[in-house]
Amino acid sequence: MVFLKKLIKLKNNLKEKFKNKKIIIAYSGGIDSLLLSILLSEITETLCIFIKTPYISEWSLNNAIINAKKYNLNLKVIKIDKIIKNVPERCYLCKKMFFEILTKEKEKYNYDVVVDGTNYDDLFEDRPGLRAKEEFNIGSPFADFKIGKKDILEIAKELNINIPPKETCLLTRFEFNREISIEDLKKIEELEEFLRNYVKGAIRVRDYKNLAVIEIEDDLSKIINEKEEIIKKFKDYGFKKVCINLEIYRSY
């Protein structure tokens, strides 16, 4: 009953604010932007835009496309070749680039507003992208209506919406200020894809040059049981040592 009241209130708030407006949604394929896209597409005309860069994995793109088709979302994929500088402000620089692209799309196709899936909890975390959001006047309905991550997960589960594993860009696998090439990104992307043969959920391969650190949210024994093949694969890619982070990676 509490869930139903919360959902009805959220839908009414979205309808009141966005009815008859054309909306571009910054769509990453994560649960926040996915749920927002589903709810807004029931109310008005929407265009979900996924921006594919060399540091966004093909796995993330494919998942985003699959869910867009599953929930009948109007999706546009924009591919760019630029790799932002791997500096402490990389998240801000990335979001700034993304929001600039989305704003140009809004103006080009006469949409009224650009929104993203920022939720209420995000406002209280250290998120450099929030500064870029403010600079481009990007709307955040979940944050505006005080909908946090727990609310989003609850609504998604109750509506039987598939909850994708939490993904971050491939640049987060590297330490700040290290110069990153296309080859570096491809190496990590291919190794994470290789590990999906053994485990489910979120996977991270941290690159410390000669050392690779594997993080997963699935059962660690699935990696340990296949260690010989995994070690060989990683050494084929140039790593001298392969370690497992014993602390389970948590998506949510």
Swiss-Prot record:
One of its GO terms (molecular function) is sulfurtransferase activity. It comes from the Archaea. Coiled coil: none annotated. Disulfide bonds: none annotated. Belongs to the LarE family. PANTHER family: EXSB FAMILY PROTEIN, NAD_GMP SYNTHASE DOMAIN-CONTAINING PROTEIN. This is Uncharacterized protein MJ0830. It comes from Methanocaldococcus jannaschii (strain ATCC 43067 / DSM 2661 / JAL-1 / JCM 10045 / NBRC 100440).
